[in-house]
């Protein structure tokens, strides 16, 4: 008897739990459907108390309930509104995200060590002002010395890649101002020594030595300016609004050319009056170089500059044609006095005539055979 009662109680409890789970499943499905029509007025059916979200999970008395609906006389609890089901779903998703976050591995010590290592490497690459003065500038100083004193065509045993890298690192470490100051000071000291050597030169070697100094310096600039291109781009052009090449040319003008122009120009005019006292290439290099340094110096000797630089003099005037012809005749007489003859005025040269005659004779002899 007791066993049958226990079985009936167990069966009723299981049926109640099945019905409860079925009702919960139907409520969850109805939450995603379209909302039901509004309930009848409160006068006909009393409004039951609204249960909080999840109230369906609370224990209820064991009552036999049909699976298809409640029995007569037992009111059915209200359906949870869609909003409550949405909140439940959102809470479940948040709980799932929190569970994933908890399951994610915490940052290990190796990642922290890698960050610290990269930071320490960055700090180790910092170039202090002491490092610049003791390591980087001495390399640049030695390379500049070799470039300024090289002769045209000489091989210089320096690494352009190493010098370029030194300049790049110093610019990145904010040493551009100090490097530019050291470069200007270095080249200024070199040009002052060159000027003193020219002052001690005798007159017969003065023009030739000035030509060597000018050509050597201009050739050195073709290597120095590209090596300091980063300093020129990110410091001189942006902060000083100038160009490195213009600054270095100005140094030669101020420290060498301006100090020697009044001694050099009379010697150039004298050499011009005496043909071939100075080679034409030397004369052309000096005149073109002076015009590059300071175009205003053309006014000191317009005739001299006009022989090597076009369009210096004003255009010819018809009234001065006789004067131009007289100058040309004078120049031709000077050439004759120095051993230059006019020679044969025909288009053929003597050697060509002999070669033509011999070839024609050979052809005729072959034809008769």
UniProtKB/Swiss-Prot annotation:
InterPro entries to which the protein is assigned, alphabetical: CACUL1, Cullin_N, Cullin_repeat-like_dom_sf
Record-given protein name: CDK2-associated and cullin domain-containing protein 1
Membership in a protein family: Belongs to the cullin family.
Tissue expression profile of the protein: Ubiquitously expressed with highest expression in the mammary gland and large intestine. Highly expressed in cancer tissues and cancer cell lines. During cell cycle progression expression is high in G1/S, low in the middle of S phase, and increases again in S/G2 phase.
GO molecular function annotation: protein kinase binding; ubiquitin protein ligase binding
Function summary: Cell cycle associated protein capable of promoting cell proliferation through the activation of CDK2 at the G1/S phase transition.
Gene assigned in the entry: CACUL1
Example GO biological process: ubiquitin-dependent protein catabolic process
Species this chain originates from: Homo sapiens (Human)
Region Disordered, residue ranges: 1-56, 342-369
Coiled coil residues, start to end: none
